[in-house]
Amino acid sequence: MNELVVATKNKGKLADFQTLFTDRYIVKSLYDYPEVPEIIEDGDTFHENAAKKAETLAAYLQKLVIADDSGLLIDALGGKPGVYSARYAGEPKNDQANIDKVLSELDGVPTQKRTARFFCVIALAEPGKETIFAEGACEGRITEKPTGSNGFGYDPIFFVPSHGQTMAELSAGTKNQLSHRARALTALKETIEGVWPK
């Protein structure tokens, strides 16, 4: 079975990738390759950041690498925090500080104008081959206060109207069906099954 390296040290993300790909690949993460150089995500788009991570690591490791870049796009904030989602409140990255900043900026914005989406771009790179991309989105709105303890990042303030709960209140199984990353992963899996059959 071929190895697939997921370009992350985020255990939540890694679990999402493992769920979908363990039937096809031996899934590894950056924990298995501590020597890899840190890649600065300095792109202006999710596509640029995902490609940079996947292609740089694929060349370095000479292996199949999958990387993603994702973020929260809030309509009332003109699409912010966008590519800066992980570090929206500055360095070091801190989920609670990011949530606090978003809620502060949305103070006084009515519920119907708090629409937002999680957006994810996944890049799959292999040395000598063209990088494959997939996208996924999950629509929702930003709550006025955090609710729920599952998930990570902005999950406690991202309300999913179809389920009447925040991402942080949903079970892992439900989140894996709905999330932007799950949708991008499903799209990627369908693409690679067409390109690289078992």
Swiss-Prot record:
Binding-site residues, Mg(2+): 69
Cofactor list: Mg(2+)
Reactions catalysed: XTP + H2O = XMP + diphosphate + H(+); dITP + H2O = dIMP + diphosphate + H(+); ITP + H2O = IMP + diphosphate + H(+)
GO terms classed as biological process: nucleotide metabolic process; purine nucleoside triphosphate catabolic process
SUPFAM superfamilies: ITPase-like (SSF52972)
Assembly mode: Homodimer.
Function recorded in the entry: Pyrophosphatase that catalyzes the hydrolysis of nucleoside triphosphates to their monophosphate derivatives, with a high preference for the non-canonical purine nucleotides XTP (xanthosine triphosphate), dITP (deoxyinosine triphosphate) and ITP. Seems to function as a house-cleaning enzyme that removes non-canonical purine nucleotides from the nucleotide pool, thus preventing their incorporation into DNA/RNA and avoiding chromosomal lesions.
Classification via NCBIfam families: PRK14822.1, RdgB/HAM1 family non-canonical purine NTP pyrophosphatase
Alphabetized HAMAP family for the sequence: Non_canon_purine_NTPase
Official protein name in the record: dITP/XTP pyrophosphatase
Species annotation: Shouchella clausii (strain KSM-K16)
Lineage: Bacteria, Bacillati, Bacillota, Bacilli, Bacillales
